[in-house]
Amino acid sequence: AYLNFPFFFIRSVAYIFGWWYASKRLIALSRQEDVEGGLISYKRSITLSAIFIVFFGYSSSMMAWDWIMSIDTHWFSTLFGWFVFSSMGVTGFTMIAMISIVLKRKGFLKYVNENHIHDLGKWIFAFSILWTYMWFSQFMLIWYSNIPEEVTYYMARWDNYNALFWITSIINFIFPLLILMSRDSKRNFGYIMTVGVIVLIGHWCNVFLMIEPGVMKEHWNIGFTEIGMFVGFLGLFLLVVNNALSKAPLFVKNHPFADESIHHHI
């Protein structure tokens, strides 16, 4: 009953609408703050953000159950929602860092410096470790318990996706760990861009491994369909981001912590 089409459709619409509404409302409050000043819009944005964090925590986990975990119909994991959430966190902070660096190099974000990128690098590092923790916890518990209904999920990936399975795990853990452990590497724009590209590739492979074995079984390949979908959604993402960036100033005017952000130093 949970996965019947009407209820599934209603949940999917609720997720997307909730995320869309929160983003639009936060943007509107930020622009209103630029025009009016004061603390009213700022306090409203804080309240909305606090509510949205709770909503996103629940909705992102349920989205993972509905859109990904349900592909392997008879398998479930109570960690799966957090596993997907941590992957979303890594890729989200990675894209923020990479876009910020590109805009900085183009001269659009003159206030951004290595201190701001350092903070983003710490978030990328932290979420990479969180992703690894979730990955290992899920894997170890299922492997140790050795329950047939659970191990089938990993057997399908070991038997037919073995190389990609281990390469993905190494890329998403070892690479960020070794490169971003030091302070200097998190402050280096070139390092962050390089790590960002590798991390995005690694988490694309992670999504591929979550979906493809349940859909194609052993008959899989990375061909024009997979690459085309990736390029298509990347193009759509860049179109939406560029369109949004072109419609508003890239730096706030009346935010109470604007000066503190400009002079941020760590």
Per-region residue spans from a language model:
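Long, contiguous internal "core" modules enriched in hydrophobic/ aromatic residues
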Residues: 5-168, 255-258
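Membrane-water interface at the C-terminal end of transmembrane alpha helices
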Residues: 23, 236-248
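Membrane-interface transmembrane-helix boundary segments in multi-pass integral membrane proteins
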Residues: 78-84, 149-169, 188, 216-241
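Alpha-helical transmembrane segments in multipass membrane proteins, preferentially the mid-helix core
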Residues: 97-100, 104, 170-185
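A cytosolic-side transmembrane-helix exit/cap motif
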Residues: 99, 210-219
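Hydrophobic, well-ordered secondary-structure elements that form the walls
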Residues: 133, 176, 207, 249
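Central hydrophobic cores of alpha-helical transmembrane segments
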Residues: 190-201
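Short, highly charged, low-complexity non-transmembrane loops/tails of multi-pass membrane proteins
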Residues: 250-266
